[in-house]
Amino acid sequence: MSMRVGILTSGGDSPGLNAAIRGFGKAAVSTYGMELIGFRDGMRGLAENRFMQLDSHALSGILTTGGTILGTSRDKVHKMLVDGKVQNMIPVIKKNYEKNKLDALVCLGGGGTAKNAKRLSDAGMNVITLPKTIDNDLVGTDQTFGFATALEIATDAVDRLHSTAHSHHRIILTEIMGHRAGWLALGAGIAGGADVILLPEVPYNVESIAAAISRRSAHGSNFSVVAVAEGARNERDAAELAAADALVREADSPVARDAAKTHRANVEASHRAHTFTLATELEKATGLESRVTILGYVQRGGTPCGRDRVLATVLGTAGADLVAKGVFGVMVAAKGDGAEPVPLEEVAGKIRRVPVDHPWIRAAKEVGTGFGD
């Protein structure tokens, strides 16, 4: 009897999602004769049992398209808002899994999806994940699909900002996505020739940044471009966040943990305008006009680049191979040119940050890029 498999996309949208759906789906249907259904709008669609058939026709023509044909959401399976109340929907999801006679569930997503998938796996469902996020911050995989496209978009933005910064003798700060990891800002900063790159992993000192910019001015370069990761913080704010993180780790009960998480969210919210604050501080310190550009969601949109299409296809087809072999409870990780399974417990709840001695950081420093430290 052929296997019946469900697939969904969860968390933020990302270039390459449709390519991964296609890669898994075509291999599952054509190579292994599986029946494939796609749940709409992520975990919420799974809880509400909303799905569509994914046959060869539905999987055609989506390789190059952005977004996700299935829709997505950021719902947590154990804390989902339903009818005005936060409810644990894992029992409902398991009933739908059994009602649809699924042999496996494939979840495409990032860190939050890995945690959701681990909960479903622990509840007795056969689950695998494919690593999707422009942040490139998942543990256990060399790269996530979506990152390469976002890197191209962010690099193009940094390129373009050079000419306007030069023309008006300004400091231009461009805020780049990445959540609490600096991979995207670091890559775009290097590729775009940013003069300063600010990362979550390297708390910055405003005086150090101002001094680097002033040195450029003294040598005739009366402009600077600063690539700012959205999670970058000055030394004081970074210490405040670290203390809030410690409270979450040390919480000894669910109630204490929820309270600590709320405190951490409030601390993070108080830093929301950090790039604008930094621009004001640099303008005062250097005498140069400062402007801020927030790249925002443009980094997640549009058609995936060739590299992401290849990676999504490799991971998708490898996922179909694993399902056919009965390998579950894993993320399909990119390793070299191929893929291999990594247990979900090694991925869920963890963040792959940029090591401060990473070759990219060393290379950037050797070409004169500052990091504000």
Curated annotation (Swiss-Prot):
Annotated site location: Important for substrate specificity: 112
BP terms from Gene Ontology: canonical glycolysis; fructose 1,6-bisphosphate metabolic process; fructose 6-phosphate metabolic process
Alphabetical keyword list: ATP-binding, Cytoplasm, Glycolysis, Kinase, Magnesium, Metal-binding, Nucleotide-binding, Transferase
GO cellular component term of the entry, any: 6-phosphofructokinase complex
The EC number(s) this enzyme carries: 2.7.1.11
Names of required cofactors: Mg(2+)
Pathway noted in the entry: Carbohydrate degradation; glycolysis; D-glyceraldehyde 3-phosphate and glycerone phosphate from D-glucose: step 3/4
Quaternary organization: Homodimer or homotetramer.
Functional description taken from the UniProt entry: Catalyzes the phosphorylation of D-fructose 6-phosphate to fructose 1,6-bisphosphate by ATP, the first committing step of glycolysis.
Family, as annotated: Belongs to the phosphofructokinase type A (PFKA) family. Mixed-substrate PFK group III subfamily.
Protein name: ATP-dependent 6-phosphofructokinase
